[in-house]
């Protein structure tokens, strides 16, 4: 029996090793077969064989054993695209109870798609809408759906929760109908006339409506208040503010509020983390390379990351030929004679000396100054002024370059025949390329020289328009260089006066468009109004004159009235400028209005304006431009002084009539 059992075992193992064991399928249940003919030892052998046989992996072979027509494919849950668009976002923790109802109403009743909820509570810095803000963003299906959705949502909030929402960008029902009706009427008129309607923004919609529900009081809300201190003014309001942003699909993709307000931990990924790690490693490497290799300190050095130094934009930017030291702390030798305070005092002393020289130049009359400037740029010692200036410069290249540049600017401003604007531009390029700094006063003098009309003898090689473009571009480049050096020139009246003079210079070309120049003058006035400059001093009076010469009458009288408000009263010089500029402008209607209104106002000033030679000549020229005749001219101002001055005005008018 033992030999038979071993033979059966060997046959079974050999059969198992030759072919893989297959699991058979039966339609009848397994039967427990019992035979009385077999002995107990045979059952033991079968049991032993059953335990020794390898157990197949049913999970691995189930797909192979089951025929293809009996295999059941796994169920793949697919969501419809429309259902995905209409999913309601999850409500954050500690949100007001009204939040879930608002989301359901926006999705089911209003019909907004792709809704996103942004929890902006606890943000630092705070959003512009407040500290505790929950923002809901949704897309409407069109412009009409956008307006209807916002209107119905506001009405639902008022009727259901007694809230007072504010919808920014929403037009009322009647207002929207009126605007649409007017737009359709304009389109019909344009089509009947054979033209196309204006496609500019009609103000009907911007594709974006912001519904500010307001603060929703909820005692369950945990306020994330900052400890110590407060922000803003007034009492601290509790509750959470809910804001619903409704967009059209195009406007939502353009604005992309989700990217703006999403927390950084949600938008960062492995790539951004990798970039931050690389940037930090690069910063550490640069920090180690900038640390000195040896030091004499007894304490160990530490690599403490420090933020980069902040640049003060109010400081001037200077050029330097010295290489920047890599070490943070620079050791100054005890034997060094270099002292920054002494250098600063020396530079200030040089500027004071230069300003004293040019004050002397400004004290001379134009004819005397033209004579003192010599024959041209090569003349350095024919006059006393040139000898003093170049002897002061000495061998200092900076001082010599500055003096040459400023003397050329003064000569061009006086229309000296030996100096040209091209030579002045060449000197300016040499000055800036050498790294020499110009003060604000010097830069304005140079730019003003470029805007002075040229002599006729210098206008032969190029056309007038080309010369005008060169002059304006050169002046603006000088101002650009001054702004790059750190000067805050935007608050200076002289900058805008330069722009006005550039416009006047552009009108020197006969082909120039006066309407275009007037439009640019209006833009300059708008910029000055936005900045809020004070109308005081000589620069403000120059701005006033330039505005009237460019046809900006409203801008002229804006400064004229502001002068009386800021300074208390107008002087005889102000009235002389008033009448003289109206005469130079050449507009008869404006000149007549000026004479009718402001001659009588001179007697109401405190003190009253008395006649002198300058104002008498200005009134006569203004009356002549206004079209009045000397025989019929009468002053509306009744005073003994002005009655005596009337014959002088009439005589001046007759002289002008004879000259014409």
Curated annotation (Swiss-Prot):
Protein family per UniProt: Belongs to the ATP25 family.
GO CC, one annotated term: mitochondrial inner membrane
Function: Probable mitochondrial mRNA stabilization factor.
Places the protein is found: Mitochondrion inner membrane
Gene that this polypeptide is encoded by: atp25
Organism: Talaromyces marneffei (strain ATCC 18224 / CBS 334.59 / QM 7333)
Source species, domain of life: Eukaryota
GO BP annotations, alphabetical order: mitochondrial gene expression; mRNA stabilization
Presence of keyword rRNA processing: no
Membrane topology value: Peripheral membrane protein
Transit peptide: 1-32
Disordered, as annotated region: 287-313
Coiled-coil positions: none
Stored PANTHER family: ATPASE SYNTHESIS PROTEIN 25, MITOCHONDRIAL
Protein name from the UniProt record: ATPase synthesis protein 25, mitochondrial
Biased composition (Polar residues): 287-302
Keyword annotations from UniProtKB, A to Z: Membrane, Mitochondrion, Mitochondrion inner membrane, Transit peptide
């Amino acid at each position: 029996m033992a030999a038979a059992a071993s033979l059966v075992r060997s046959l079974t193992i050999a059969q198992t090793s030759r072919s893989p064991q297959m699991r058979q399928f039966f339609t009848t249940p397994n039967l427990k077969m019992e035979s009385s003919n077999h002995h107990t030892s045979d059952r033991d052998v079968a049991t032993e064989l059953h335990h020794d046989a390898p157990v197949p992996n049913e999970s691995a072979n189930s797909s192979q054993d089951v025929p293809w027509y009996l295999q059941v494919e796994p169920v793949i849950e697919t969501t419809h695209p429309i259902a995905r668009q209409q999913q309601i976002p999850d409500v954050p923790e500690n949100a007001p109870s009204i939040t879930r109802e608002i989301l359901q109403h926006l999705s089911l009743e209003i019909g907004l798609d792709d809704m996103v909820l942004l929890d902006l509570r606890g943000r630092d810095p705070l959003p512009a809408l407040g500290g505790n803000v929950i923002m809901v963003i949704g897309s409407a299906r069109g412009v009409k759906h956008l307006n209807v959705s916002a209107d119905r949502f506001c009405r639902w909030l008022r009727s259901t929760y007694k809230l007072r929402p504010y919808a920014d960008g929403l037009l009322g029902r009647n207002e929207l109908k009126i605007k649409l009706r007017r737009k359709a009427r304009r389109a019909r008129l344009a089509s009947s006339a054979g033209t196309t309607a204006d496609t500019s923004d009609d103000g009907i919609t911007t594709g974006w409506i912001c519904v500010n529900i307001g603060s929703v009081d909820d005692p369950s809300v945990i306020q994330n208040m900052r400890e110590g201190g407060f922000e803003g003014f007034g009492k601290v309001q509790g509750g959470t503010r809910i804001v619903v942003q409704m967009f059209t699909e195009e406007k939502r993709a353009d604005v992309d509020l989700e990217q703006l307000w999403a927390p950084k931990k949600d938008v960062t990924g492995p790539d951004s983390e990798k970039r931050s790690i690389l940037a930090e490693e690069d910063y550490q490497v640069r920090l180690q390379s900038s640390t000195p290799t040896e030091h004499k300190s007894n304490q160990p050095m530490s690599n403490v990351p420090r933020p980069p130094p902040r640049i003060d934009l109010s400081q001037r930017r200077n050029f330097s030929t010295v290489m920047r030291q890599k070490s943070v702390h620079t050791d100054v030798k005890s034997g060094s004679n270099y002292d920054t305070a002494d250098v600063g005092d020396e530079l200030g002393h040089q500027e004071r000396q230069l300003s004293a020289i040019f004050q002397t130049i400004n004290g001379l009359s134009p004819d005397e100054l033209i004579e003192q400037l010599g024959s041209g740029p090569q003349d350095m010692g024919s006059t006393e002024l040139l000898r003093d200036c170049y002897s002061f410069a000495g061998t200092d290249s900076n001082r010599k370059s500055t003096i040459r540049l400023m003397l050329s600017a003064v000569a061009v401003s006086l229309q000296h025949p030996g100096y040209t604007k091209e030579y002045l531009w060449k000197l300016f390029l040499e000055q800036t390329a050498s790294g020499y700094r110009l003060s604000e006063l010097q830069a304005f003098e140079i730019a003003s020289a470029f805007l002075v009309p040229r002599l006729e003898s210098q206008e032969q090689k190029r056309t007038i328009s080309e010369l005008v473009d060169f002059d304006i571009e050169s002046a603006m480049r000088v101002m650009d260089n001054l702004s790059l050096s750190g000067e805050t020139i935007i608050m200076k009246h002289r900058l805008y006066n330069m722009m006005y003079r550039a416009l006047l210079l552009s009108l020197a070309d006969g082909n120039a468009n006066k309407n275009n120049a007037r439009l640019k003058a209006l833009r300059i006035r708008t910029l000055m109004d936005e900045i809020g400059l004070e109308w005081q001093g000589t620069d403000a009076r120059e701005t006033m004159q330039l505005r009237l010469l460019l046809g900006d009458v409203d801008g002229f009288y804006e400064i004229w009235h502001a002068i009386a408000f800021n300074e208390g009263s107008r002087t005889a010089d102000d009235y002389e400028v008033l009448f003289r500029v109206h005469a130079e402008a050449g507009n008869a209607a404006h000149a007549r209005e000026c004479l009718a209104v402001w001659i009588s106002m001179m007697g109401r000033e405190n003190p009253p304006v008395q006649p002198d030679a300058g104002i008498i000549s200005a009134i006569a020229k203004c009356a002549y431009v206004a079209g009045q005749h000397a025989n019929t001219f009468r002053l509306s101002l009744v005073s003994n002084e002005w009655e005596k001055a009337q014959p002088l005005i009439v005589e001046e008018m007759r002289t002008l009539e004879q000259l014409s």
